[in-house]
């Protein structure tokens, strides 16, 4: 049996916050598919940091960083991206720690990124019967706003966090923004990258919502997180209005992010 694909340019980043035992199987599946894999424990209080550190002690392809306090998904990803950039990595695939994202699709997304290094490779979620209808309908609204804010640049799903980012432009964006540190990270990242001319490539990837009896954990809070998304889209709409003339010129002339191929 062949081992995981190894790369000196592309790294898998898994932020984790109170995910419970599911994080172990998620990390093991990611490691079976890719090397290296970096996990950022974002102030978890569930005791998994110790178990992950033990896994990393016996695995040269696994790195685990433990943050003292919870700062949010975007902050955890930024921590990993800064370290990855310093070590010469150019791209990072982010995936959730709770088993929603398919580790067996890591290689496919990484291959697209290697073939198109100037693009962001976005997972396009394929839902099964486990997907909560309210969540599916809610993301349609957010995706419609994203479509407007990017002048239909081709982002199939702005919320699905299984994706490959070019590291350098995303780190620069995060350093310039006080936001994008929590649930607003995934959507704002792809919108601002598109504004920078980073073209999206969409790749189908199944998503699975685990039940509580399967160990599924959700930190989504309907009121709090929808308020955060509403504020985010207000910011992005203002940014869109300021950038509209240049986006129109890019679309007419076929410049990134609108250029195909």
List the predicted regions and their residue ranges:
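Cell-envelope/extracellular polymer assembly enzymes that use nucleotide-activated donors
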Residues: 9-11, 36, 188
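Short, well-formed alpha-helical segments that are part of the catalytic scaffolds
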Residues: 17-32
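Acceptor/aglycone-binding surface of glycosyltransferases and processive sugar-polymer synthases
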Residues: 69-86, 103-183, 210-220, 224-230
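Conserved donor nucleotide-binding strand/loop of the catalytic core
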Residues: 38, 50-87
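Acidic helix N-cap motif at the loop->helix transition within catalytic regions
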Residues: 21-25, 46-55
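A conserved acidic beta->alpha catalytic loop
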Residues: 41-50, 99
């Amino acid at each position: 049996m062949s081992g995981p694909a190894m790369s000196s340019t592309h790294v898998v980043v898994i932020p984790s916050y109170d995910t419970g035992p599911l994080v172990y199987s998620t990390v093991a599946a990611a490691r079976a598919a890719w090397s290296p894999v970096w996990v950022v424990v974002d102030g978890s209080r569930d005791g998994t940091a110790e178990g992950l550190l033990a896994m990393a002690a016996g695995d040269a392809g696994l790195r685990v960083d433990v943050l003292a306090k919870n700062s949010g998904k975007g902050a955890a990803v930024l921590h990993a991206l800064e370290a990855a950039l310093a070590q010469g990595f150019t791209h990072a695939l982010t995936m959730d720690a709770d088993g929603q994202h398919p580790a067996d699709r890591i290689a496919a997304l990484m291959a697209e990124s290697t073939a198109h290094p100037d693009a962001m490779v976005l997972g396009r979620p394929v839902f099964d019967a486990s997907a909560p209808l309210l969540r599916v309908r809610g993301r349609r609204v957010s995706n419609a706003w994203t479509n407007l804010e990017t002048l239909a640049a081709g982002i199939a799903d702005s919320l699905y966090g299984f994706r490959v980012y070019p590291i350098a432009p995303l780190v620069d964006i995060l350093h310039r923004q006080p936001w994008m540190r929590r649930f607003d990270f995934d959507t704002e990242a792809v919108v601002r990258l598109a504004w920078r001319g980073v073209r999206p490539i969409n790749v189908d990837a199944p998503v699975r919502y685990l039940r509580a009896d399967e160990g599924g954990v959700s930190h989504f809070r309907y009121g709090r997180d929808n308020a955060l998304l509403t504020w985010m889209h207000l910011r992005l709409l203002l940014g869109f209005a300021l950038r509209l003339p240049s986006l129109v010129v890019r679309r007419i002339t076929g410049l990134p992010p609108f250029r195909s191929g």
